[in-house]
Amino acid sequence: MNIIEGSFEAKGKKFAIVVSRFNHFIVDSLLDGAVDALKRHGNVNDEDITIVRVPGAYELPLAAKKIAKKGEADAIIAIGAVIRGGTPHFDFVAGESNKGLAQVCLESEIPVSFGVITTDSIEQAIERAGTKAGNKGAEAALGALEMVNVLAQI
């Protein structure tokens, strides 16, 4: 029986982090968590991490697609925070961002890790950005590290 599993070691691999500026007070903590995870768990150097800032979560898929087409990243990490308000805007932005990022991943065959938190309140967002519920940016980075290694073995 052959079992393929990923590890976190990724020295020499290139990572792009596409980051939404909207809700930056939350997103900055998610970004810090992602960068820390890449360096600490993946042994990734600063020069192998590219950070691309876009206006909001809706713009993440287009930037990820452009990065994937260039072929210079082994994995892409998408980071953002969509917080529910009083209108259906939340549903459109969260759904289209998720769908677009999944499409980029499947079409490019490059891991696109989903670090976009979708919450009902600012309090929930804060919890997912490094307090009670861990840091979802760090979790997305760990997923990217593992997938780079899994795909290299398939």
Curated annotation (Swiss-Prot):
Q: Which GO terms describe its biological process?
A: riboflavin biosynthetic process
What NCBIfam families has UniProt attached to this entry? lumazine-synth, PRK00061.1-4
- Enzyme nomenclature, EC number: 2.5.1.78
- Source organism per UniProt: Colwellia psychrerythraea (strain 34H / ATCC BAA-681) (Vibrio psychroerythus)
**Pfam families per record:** DMRL_synthase (PF00885)
What residues does (2S)-2-hydroxy-3-oxobutyl phosphate bind to? 86-87, 128
The protein's name: 6,7-dimethyl-8-ribityllumazine synthase
The catalytic residues are 89
UniProt KW keywords: Riboflavin biosynthesis, Transferase
Recall the GO molecular function terms of this protein's record: 6,7-dimethyl-8-ribityllumazine synthase activity
Family from the record: Belongs to the DMRL synthase family.
The role this protein plays is:
Catalyzes the formation of 6,7-dimethyl-8-ribityllumazine by condensation of 5-amino-6-(D-ribitylamino)uracil with 3,4-dihydroxy-2-butanone 4-phosphate. This is the penultimate step in the biosynthesis of riboflavin.
Indicate whether Transferase appears among the record's keywords: yes
Subunit structure and binding partners: Forms an icosahedral capsid composed of 60 subunits, arranged as a dodecamer of pentamers.
Which residues constitute the signal peptide according to the record? none
Enumerate the residues binding 5-amino-6-(D-ribitylamino)uracil: 22, 57-59, 81-83, 114
List the GO terms this entry assigns under cellular component, sorted alphabetically: cytosol; riboflavin synthase complex
The UniProt catalytic activity note for this protein reads: (2S)-2-hydroxy-3-oxobutyl phosphate + 5-amino-6-(D-ribitylamino)uracil = 6,7-dimethyl-8-(1-D-ribityl)lumazine + phosphate + 2 H2O + H(+)
Q: Which pathway is this protein assigned to?
A: Cofactor biosynthesis; riboflavin biosynthesis; riboflavin from 2-hydroxy-3-oxobutyl phosphate and 5-amino-6-(D-ribitylamino)uracil: step 1/2
